[in-house]
């Protein structure tokens, strides 16, 4: 049997970018044959990627790419916060958002089919899953192209905002930061979704009914609650986060700036995170190990 040296492991890792232990196992299985070890790794890492693909991805990052009036905002998910800080994962997300801005794919499937570094995006993704050991997937994106100016703001890597505007760049950047902090659901009161208003109205009606007031007073209480809600969730009517003496609309008017629209992505929003029972997980791993050695 051929002795597996550190140099051999290092050479295989340089060729495949696979973890050290995986390289050593592959070389041992291949009895030192480098080409055979590469083939073994391709099979193993592909299998690893397939197993990971069914796992929940509720962590990740939001990436942005802006160039004057063209740009994109993209969320890429992984399983843990630790991997969301991995350099290879970050590079993959940034490569993907640039492709969205440049190539204008119709959807995530089209993005995965685009070429990237001599492979498709999906092939790069699968190799990254094999290397890192977690499921990774672009979740959604939005591309921007038109006559409006664009500005982006990333709060760390978990919240991303793109604002479409006309006017002053600094004012627009301030608005992007405000959006990340205050999370409005619409530009103006008229833009708030009807279903959101219906939910708020239902809650307001129940609360007002419990007051025991006459019907006409109850109706006024409900309408007052709705108007308060609309002001709180519409960007232009919110109190500006950097100056509580004025609304966002007043700040923009003073800066001669108009917001045409905005998009905000928050990592994992709407995804139900998997809740693991750690003790049960450890017990299952111990049982599996015992079975394997039995």
From Swiss-Prot:
Chief location: cytoplasm
Subcellular locations according to the entry: Cytoplasm
Pfam families given in the database record: EF_TS (PF00889)
Matching InterPro entries: EF-Ts_dimer_sf, Transl_elong_EFTs/EF1B, Transl_elong_EFTs/EF1B_dimer, Transl_elong_Ts_CS, UBA-like_sf
Gene3D superfamilies named in the record: 1.10.286.20, DNA helicase RuvA subunit, C-terminal domain (1.10.8.10), Elongation factor Ts, dimerisation domain (3.30.479.20)
Region feature (Involved in Mg(2+) ion dislocation from EF-Tu): 80-83
A GO term for molecular function: translation elongation factor activity
Record-linked CDD domains: UBA_EF-Ts
Keywords for the protein's UniProt record, in alphabetical order: Cytoplasm, Elongation factor, Protein biosynthesis
SUPFAM superfamilies for the chain: Elongation factor Ts (EF-Ts), dimerisation domain, UBA-like
Domain of life: Bacteria
Gene Ontology annotations for the cellular component aspect, listed alphabetically: cytoplasm
Family: Belongs to the EF-Ts family.
Summary of the function given for this chain in its UniProt record: Associates with the EF-Tu.GDP complex and induces the exchange of GDP to GTP. It remains bound to the aminoacyl-tRNA.EF-Tu.GTP complex up to the GTP hydrolysis stage on the ribosome.
Annotated NCBIfam families: tsf (TIGR00116)
Record's protein name: Elongation factor Ts
Gene name linked to the record: tsf
